Amino acid sequence: MGKTYSSPVNPIPKAPKGLAIHHWLNFLQAAYRLQPGPSEFDFHQLRKFLKLAIKTPVWLNPINYSVLARLIPKNYPGRVHEIVAILIQETPAREAPPSAPPADDPQKPPPYPEHAQVEPQCLPVLHPHGAPATHRPWQMKDLQAIKQEVSSSAPGSPQFMQTVRLAVQQFDPTAKDLHDLLQYLCSSLVASLHHQQLETLIAQAETQGITGYNPLAGPLRVQANNPNQQGLRREYQNLWLSAFSALPGNTKDPTWAAILQGPEEPFCSFVERLNVALDNGLPEGTPKDPILRSLAYSNANKECQKLLQARGQTNSPLGEMLRACQTWTPRDKNKILMIQPKKTPPPNQPCFRCGQAGHWSRDCKQPRPPPGPCPLCQDPAHWKQDCPQLKADTKGSEDLLLDLPCEASHVRERKNSSGGED
């Protein structure tokens, strides 16, 4: 049986290696215009074909979709032919120059009327062939997939903005959809600050004037919810994204500010953790090197701080700080070195026991002298257990036992015989 492919769980399929993101977005937008919608098998075959097409010499930048269509093998599985055909139809509209004021009215001020041909849109705003644009709300699997992509990034960081910007280009959400996305991705405090910045940007945009905006039709947020108002929806999406970069700062202490070097952690590992945390936590456009140098010294352990202070490199370039701390040994290695026995030289003074030099008293082979005279003979040269009198008394008792009278053997035999006769 053939392999079955279900609908894609990730709403933003990964781009093939070597293909630019904006080119991959064009292919995705064309794929989502297919009726019925594309399946996971279609995306799999599209990625497989693009990986092979990138290696061919006819691959150009910008992409010539007509030449790319000739590279598709006959009876190629999937709907790659239809996707490339949609891109070929949209190529003239994308390459058309912007409209200019007519020659008979050179004083006509901007903005000039938009081009009649518009870019293809994706979910949740649907553009079926021959029917007006309709709206489809977010699905939970879409929100979960986007949140999984930004789970390790702080709001406003480059990774966060790249993922959210790609999702906005992919799904073309309305103002209500963007509000739901913000509530799902960020905390209530971040959402409140974002809402304040967004209201300020909307007020400035309404004052300056936006192409297609009619003040009599209601606020910009209401008009951007209309699926047919593509231009206003794009303007609102740009303002919504700009509100992240205008945030005054993190609502709580950033995670990278609490990263400290452990007492036994190498300095290079600590700096690597700091670098990864700053990449995921700094707002977009914030310089990273000054913050990294400052935290590399202020959050280091006491040993590394003393080493950097002694060399005068508390605010030096990061490479010099790493070289300065290369010779630092963690505490666990110092403990091992301290446990090893040290070879001490023999003393020059005489031993307290034998009076000879060359060894310590604890290593002396001469027995320890008695603490006082022997209680038996009052001789201070030996212990009681070694006293000669004690040994003499023991020997005398043995001699007394040997001097006891004993009967001869013939006398015992005579007694035994007489007793037996009786």
UniProtKB/Swiss-Prot annotation:
Alphabetized InterPro entries for the sequence: D_retro_matrix (IPR003139), Gag_p24_C (IPR045345), Primate_lentivir_Gag_pol-like (IPR050195), Retrov_capsid_C (IPR008916), Retrov_capsid_N (IPR008919), Retrovr_matrix (IPR010999), Znf_CCHC (IPR001878), Znf_CCHC_sf (IPR036875)
Maturation and modification: Specific enzymatic cleavages by the viral protease yield mature proteins. The polyprotein is cleaved during and after budding, this process is termed maturation.
UniProt signal peptide: none
Keyword Repeat attributed: yes
Lipidation (N-myristoyl glycine): 2
Annotated keywords: Capsid protein, Host-virus interaction, Lipoprotein, Metal-binding, Myristate, Phosphoprotein, Repeat, Viral nucleoprotein, Virion, Zinc, Zinc-finger
Pfam families given in the database record: Gag_p19, Gag_p24, Gag_p24_C, zf-CCHC
Positions of region (Disordered): 93-117
Coiled coil: none
Motif window: PPXY motif: 109-112
A Gene Ontology term for the protein's cellular component: viral nucleocapsid
Gene Ontology terms, MF aspect: nucleic acid binding; structural molecule activity; zinc ion binding
Pro residues biased stretches: 98-113
PANTHER family (UniProt xref): ENDOGENOUS RETROVIRUS GROUP K MEMBER 24 GAG POLYPROTEIN-RELATED (PTHR40389), IGE-BINDING PROTEIN (PTHR40389:SF3)
Domains as described in the record: Late-budding domains (L domains) are short sequence motifs essential for viral particle release. They can occur individually or in close proximity within structural proteins. They interacts with sorting cellular proteins of the multivesicular body (MVB) pathway. Most of these proteins are class E vacuolar protein sorting factors belonging to ESCRT-I, ESCRT-II or ESCRT-III complexes.
Assembly and interaction partners: Interacts with human TSG101. This interaction is essential for budding and release of viral particles.
Name of this protein: Gag polyprotein
